[in-house]
Design a protein with these regions (language model features):
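N-terminal auxiliary segments of SAM/dcSAM-dependent transferases
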Residues: 1-46
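Class I SAM-dependent methyltransferase Rossmann-like catalytic core
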Residues: 43, 48-72, 76
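Glycine-rich helix-loop-beta junction characteristic of Rossmann-like nucleotide cofactor-binding loops
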Residues: 75-84, 106, 144
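Class I SAM-dependent methyltransferase SAM/SAH-binding core
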Residues: 88-91, 96-142
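A short acidic, Gly/Pro-enriched loop at the edge of an enzyme's catalytic core
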Residues: 141-152
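Short catalytic micro-motifs in class I SAM-dependent methyltransferases
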Residues: 152, 156-160
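A short glycine-rich, Lys/Arg-flanked "PGG" loop and its adjoining helix->strand segment in the class I
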Residues: 162-168
């Protein structure tokens, strides 16, 4: 359900790449994520959280202090996606994947879960830890996801761009 950041066409996943019908191609990193942040959306050399920030957040979240919040998010997601046979769920601003991973586990194998974040370090960490989820580096200001492609979009502590969230 990812889209090409150049032309906006739907990307098809191959063995090691995503590509669109117009021939734009994006390699999968060895960790399993794809970089879909258009150069004009970066606004800095390395946007988003750096490696130390990602490590600190992961260590904090793994203490369990936000587990009740995550469980409530999962409960609401399960309730909302119940009518869908194979729900498509997008975590907009997924960070290092804590909520995304727990959400995918709660929803089970019938759900297709995607996550994106502007931080390459965060997405790399997420993709390394949560292998069954499709992760991408991308921006909330130009979400690399198909129009009306998600049955549920979650956004936990990330920038909210109402028009983009409504689009996906």
């Amino acid at each position: 359900m990812f889209i090409c950041p150049v032309c906006g066409d739907l990307l098809q996943r191959g063995e090691r790449t995503y590509s669109c019908p117009k021939g734009h191609s994006y390699d999968l990193a060895k960790e399993g994520y794809v970089y879909l942040l258009a150069p004009n959306k970066k606004h800095s050399k390395d946007p988003g959280d750096n490696k130390q920030m990602v490590s600190a957040r992961r260590a904090f979240l793994e203490t369990g202090l936000y587990q009740p919040f995550s469980e409530e998010l999962n409960r609401l997601a399960l309730q909302y996606t119940e009518p869908f046979e194979s729900p498509v769920v997008l975590d907009a601003g997924c960070g290092e994947g804590y909520y995304t991973g727990r959400l995918a586990e709660a929803l089970g194998e019938h759900a297709r879960v995607f996550g994106f974040d502007i931080s390459k370090c965060a997405v790399r960490a997420a993709a390394k830890k949560y292998r069954g989820i499709a992760f991408a580096v991308g921006s909330s200001f130009g979400i690399p996801f198909a129009e009306a492609g998600a049955d549920l979009v979650v956004n936990v502590f990330a920038p909210i761009v109402p028009g983009e969230l409504a689009r996906v």
